[in-house]
Amino acid sequence: MKCPYCAYGESKVVDSRSTEDGSSIRRRRECLKCNRRYTTYEKIETTPILVIKKNMSREYFDRNKMVNGLMKACQKRPVSRKQIEQIADEVERHISNEMLTEVNTDKIGQIIMKNLKKIDEVSYVRFASVYRQFKDINTFMEEIKNLMDKN
């Protein structure tokens, strides 16, 4: 790897450790020419995942899009950013464990709803209303009744 300061091609690793989530390795390097230090990250290369949308079009999986949708559902609710990130992690873990290269939005929505229901029922109903495309108040009432029956 070339030094970002002098572009020399050789360096030594001074320190190496896993990142907090264990998904990559952080390395402190020292250039053998200019002796300046810099940080690099080593991460497993993954195959891009395609999401099959309801209209059968495909787009690349976008974690940020999923997190933003969750944040809207959880707005002004007692759900932390960390909990939202954990749900997103669970979706990614599920896709990765099943070694899927394509996944439909139904599967993603089911995983999100299963996890969101455990955290906050109001956020769950909000998310479900968009995901399942509730058409009227009766659909909301039906979902709320199902939640209450299970409790």
Curated annotation (Swiss-Prot):
UniProt KW keywords: ATP-binding, DNA-binding, Metal-binding, Nucleotide-binding, Repressor, Transcription, Transcription regulation, Zinc, Zinc-finger
Named cofactor requirement(s): Zn(2+)
Molecular function GO labels: ATP binding; DNA binding; zinc ion binding
Entries under Pfam families matching the protein: ATP-cone, Zn_ribbon_NrdR
UniProt cofactor note: Binds 1 zinc ion.
Disulphide bridges: none
InterPro entries in UniProt: ATP-cone_dom, NrdR-like_N, RNR_NrdR-like
The keyword Metal-binding belongs to this UniProt entry's keyword annotation: yes
Any one GO biological process: negative regulation of DNA-templated transcription
Domain annotation ATP-cone: ranges: 49-139
Zinc fingers (unnamed), renumbered ranges: 3-34
Coiled coil: none
Entries under PANTHER family matching the protein: TRANSCRIPTIONAL REPRESSOR NRDR
Function statement: Negatively regulates transcription of bacterial ribonucleotide reductase nrd genes and operons by binding to NrdR-boxes.
Family membership: Belongs to the NrdR family.
Protein's UniProt name: Transcriptional repressor NrdR
Organism: Clostridium botulinum (strain 657 / Type Ba4)
Lineage: Bacteria, Bacillati, Bacillota, Clostridia, Eubacteriales
